Amino acid sequence: MKTKLVIVAALAAMTAQAEFKIDRSVMSEEYWKIWNDGAQAKIDADIEKYRKADGAFEIDAPDGTEVKAEQLTHAFFFGAHIFNFDQLGTKERNARYKALYGKEGALFNSATVAFYWRTFERFPGKPRFEAGAEDSEAFWNTCPNPKEQPHWRRPPSDPVVDYLVSRGCRIHGHPLVWGNNTWMTPNWLWDELCPEAEKAALEKASGVKVPRWNASIPAGAPSRKLSKEWQRAWKKIYAKLSEKQIAALVPTFIKAQNECYERRIRQIGARYGAKIHSWDVVNESATDFDLFKRKAVRNRPFDASHYGLMPADYAYKAFLWAGKYLPQTAWFNLNDYNMGDGFFLQAKDLTAHGARIDVVGSQMHLFNPKESANIAIGKGPEHLRPEKIAERFVRVSKANRPIHLSEITITAPDNSPKGQMIQAIIMRNCYRAWFSVEKMTGITWWNVVDACGAPGEPSISGLFTRDMQPKTAYFAMDDLVNREWKTKATVKAQGGKVSFRGFRGSYRLTWKGADGKVQTKFVNVK
């Protein structure tokens, strides 16, 4: 109860502060020529067309009775990752952070939960579902070097999922399968699953030394360095040995690797069932599909992935395993940054062979502060101009699936008041353009807090400063989600019904009955 009161107080404090007024002067005339009145009118018209619906509801009230319709929740999901759960250094910061996530009244009604295999199962057979002492708020509040900890930005899943369930927040799991060796594949996989005799035979035949892992290797940069060496080693092996030769040399590893991937999905499915509403079943695999000449060969022994050796046709298998172990109610996402032809051909190939793809995930990261500064003067990346955003999602819509804009970064050029306003305006215009896309179903901001991203990501791309003070972009986003895009209307009853048009979501209808008492009805605009 005490924790709940702290979170409610934190949310109330941020709501009381929330006010956003655009300062157009921080952007050049050239910028406003790009985001001109005509472009804005087109966005407004598409938002009205695609994000709203007409609702008609029966009520027990005489004709002419005034009825207030107040939107409570969105059908569209506005999300962010929740990787810094309890890690921000003080109870007050953590409470503010947690208060951002919830079904009603919060900024984010959806949260992306980390299931990166490398940190989720740092040691074989020991998945980090439950919290240990090193995951506690007390640990992080006294930790002098949080970014150097192996579990920084990787909280155990149970406490995060339990919290989000208590808040009625939608939960998105990221990811189940991803070939990336730096962030996903456990260091121990090769050494644990491949017998020494097979390792020696492979190294002798190829002349390539495959890096070894042991538990004494520090997490963080040393571990990531080892992963890159492992990836380079496999590229050399591919160049020297045929697929058949490799398969003959390491058959035990190939079999065990498949079993290990399947076991991971089975364990997660058994643990969470329907608690998690959607999954990035496979992440960033289109490059491999292109590498294999855009044709999935289902009888190959393994995939000679650009990431390193992967299970044969791993993207296809990931969807089959997900279908086997996860509930039918969960949405299955194919997520990628690569929106080339290969992505759409891969989606077509997967579904043609029986994979269930419910949603396609697309990413957009504006990491470079200089690019944000250039955008403000009317230059910068063309893909963030309104007409190019529209063109991109006409292309993504070719997959004929709902779209989840799954990872969004828009950095500030700097954290001065002007820099924060530039970030807020870029974010506001892009969010409006994305929200107007017909097939868009949700948008997920990536790093909520400054200086809390992965190595190489900008330190000023958050909606909050490192000490959880709201930046201008927070107020701009809250203004969109909780004001501009929430419907409040007063209508009159007619023939035992009320009708109105509003953003899709849940509503509370209130009116005074004949006895003067307030009557309430909860409805959904679909």
What is each model feature region?
Residues 24-26, 31-33, 190-223, 233, ...:
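Aromatic-rich peripheral "rim/lid" segments of glycoside hydrolase catalytic domains that contact
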Residues 104-108, 113-242, 248, 260, ...:
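Aromatic-lined substrate-binding rim segments of carbohydrate-active enzymes
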Residues 19-88, 110, 123-130, 151, ...:
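Beta-strand-rich domain onsets/edges
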Residues 79, 277-284, 309-343, 404-409, ...:
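Aromatic-lined carbohydrate-recognition surfaces of secreted/lumenal glycan-active proteins
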Residues 333-363, 422, 453:
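Substrate-binding cleft/loops of secretory-pathway carbohydrate-active enzymes
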Residues 90-106, 499-508:
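Short Pro-Gly-centered beta-turn/loop motif in secreted/extracellular proteins
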Residues 88-95, 290-294, 318, 339-354:
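Distinct, well-ordered alpha-helical segments
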Residues 57, 111, 164, 268, ...:
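Conserved, mostly hydrophobic/aromatic
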